[in-house]
Each structure stands twice: as structure tokens, then as C-alpha cells.
Amino acid sequence: MQQIQLPQGMKDTILQECEKKKYLQNTLEQIFESFGYEEIITPTIEYYETYENAFKNIQTTDMYKFFDENGRILTLRTDMTVPIARVCASKFKDSKPPFRYRYTSNVFKVRQKFAGKRSEVTDCGIELIGLHSKSDVQVLCCALEVMKNFKNYTLEIGNVQFFQAACKVVRLSTEEINTLADLIDKKSMVDLKIYLDSLYLSEKIVDFFMHLPFLCGDVNILDKAYAYCFDESLKEVLDSMKECIQSLNELGCLENVTIDLGKVAHLDYYTGIIFEGYVSGVGTSILSGGRYDCLLKKFGRDLPACGFSVKLDPLIDHVDVQLKKKFILYYPESKQIEAMKQANTLRKEGSVILEPSLNETIYVKEVE
């Protein structure tokens, strides 16, 4: 039986699922192209050291690794941002930014048994490289244009600088920052209070971290957040976010946008705004992205960047697509040529299957 089973975390995409996925992919690619993004295709296999260079705390257990003929470690790509950073720093090292790239590629991550997650997914996304945070609104507008294709969507925006600035003022160690981030991300409030007390911080600083997981909601939450700022650097982050939100409002793009200042994931990667898109009925975020101003530097080009990716596979059942009509054209063998002529005409409306029949006449049946 093993030879007809799939490895853990893998899934076949078949028949109408393929049609829906291709429709969704084409829709997103048209949006990205309309925003001026050009396509890049990179190899499925990268050197492991490419990812090791990009991420300080790389999770090697999440990667499919193997060796080439010279003993160097290879890996199936786990995302597309790192390969694009590599391409930008090599193929476009003498070109002038900004760069606008788009992609549709399968990415791979080893999933734990019974986790219910797929090990191979299709990511469709963009990267805007070479422009600073003022351009975040451009990327957010593109993300919202994608989200409009789905019913009951939400785009949730945060900024890791709000948390990072607080930690910098308090002069926390990397270990302390990571522990705090984990507790805030999990909203483990009892454990968070115990840990904060162990750091002997002032009441105002403890109050900030204790309220951070709950500074989420509509855009007005930004005004409420000022009350917990214990340093000017925190207010500057909020000022920047309010400016971005105001720009979205002026562009008519503020519908279904919410704020979550407690987003503190991937601190070794993101450097500013972060955002996630959710669709009703899908149990996880289907769009994620943010600003990552330090990644390109690791590949030899010190350029700011912002981007996002969309996971296509969870959306297959949540896209409204008019599937092409399908017909079966039955014919007696003596009238095969005539049947083929009719089929050529009928294919303007959809796909046609020619099926021999014992009947004396040609007739057509539409497949439901």
C-alpha cells in the first residue's frame, strides 16, 4: 500500500480544485502586474547556507535537507523572500532600485505529525525593494486589492517596532525579549505578569507590556495606545502608523482594516509594519507580510524592503469562480468527422468530450 500513499503533509490537487486554484492564481497575478510587479522564478532547491545566512535563529527541523554530489547541504525553499533577496543582490547588483518583483511558487516546510498542516503550499506574492516605510501604504493597498476577492475578510496591521522600542528603552537582553514576545504572542497573562515581576521593572513599564496583547481592534485603538507610551520612541511608532492609516483612509482602502499592536512574531526578521489577512471560514491567516529592512544587507545590498505572500491552497473553496462548461458529444462511428466539426464549434463555449454511441444521431449533453 505504501507506493500509492503520499508522504506526510502532502496532498494531491485534482480536477475542479485545479481549475479554482489556477483561476485564483491568475486573478492575483493580474493584480500584482497591474501594480507594476514583474515576475521572478527561482529554483526549488537552494543551498542551506543561503537560509542560514538570512535567519539568525533558523528552525532546521522545519526544512527538507539533503546533500549534493560535493557534500554541500541543499534544502527545498521554505519561502520566496530569501531567494528573491539572493537574486536581487546578485542578478541586479548593478541595477538601480526600487525593484518590484512578483512570484508564484511552491514552498516546503516539514510539519509535525497530526499537525493538520500541509508540507507543500503554493505562495503567490510580491516584494517591493528599495523604498522606505513611507511606501508601506503601497504594499498595503495591493494586499487589500487581493483581499477584496473574498467575502468577510479582515486585514490586521501591527508594527514590531512598538514592542522593540519598548525593549530597547528598558535594555532587555535578547533572551528576555524572546521570552516576553512568546508570552505576549500566546496571551499567557498570568505567566507574563510573573515574568515581568521577575525583571523588576517600573509599574508604568509593566503596565505597558500587560496591556500590549489587548491593544487590538479598529483603527481608533491607536489613540488609546498613546496612554501606555512611557518613551517618546513609542509615540513615534504610533505617529507613523497613524500616518499610514490616514493615507489608506484618503485612498478609500480602510474598510475591513483592524489594528493589533500585540503582533510580535518573527522579531529577527521584521523591522516595522507587519500584517495578516483573514477570510471567514479559513482557520488561519491566508496573507502575511511586513517590512524587513535588514535582510538584503545579509546578501551584500543594504536595501529596505516590504512585501507579502498569499497562501493559495486554503482559499480554493472560498473563491467564486465560474467554471467552464463541459459537454459530452455522443456520435455514431459513421458520423465521427461531422461530430468533430460540431465539437470544434462547441469548444467556444467550453470543453467537449467525444464519446462513441450506438445511437444513429449526434447529440450533446452538458455535464453538471
Task: List each model region and its residues.
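TRNA-binding/sensing appendages of the translation machinery
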Residues: 1-82, 90, 148
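Short secondary-structure transition/capping segments
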Residues: 4, 51-55, 168, 320, ...
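Positively charged, Gly/Ser-enriched RNA/tRNA-binding surfaces
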Residues: 17-35, 46-49, 81-93, 101-150, ...
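Structured core elements
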Residues: 41, 75, 154-156, 258, ...
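Beta-rich nucleic-acid/ligand-interaction surfaces
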Residues: 42-61, 158-168, 263-272
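Acidic, His- and aromatic-enriched active-site or binding-groove loops in soluble protein domains
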Residues: 62-68, 171-194, 201, 279
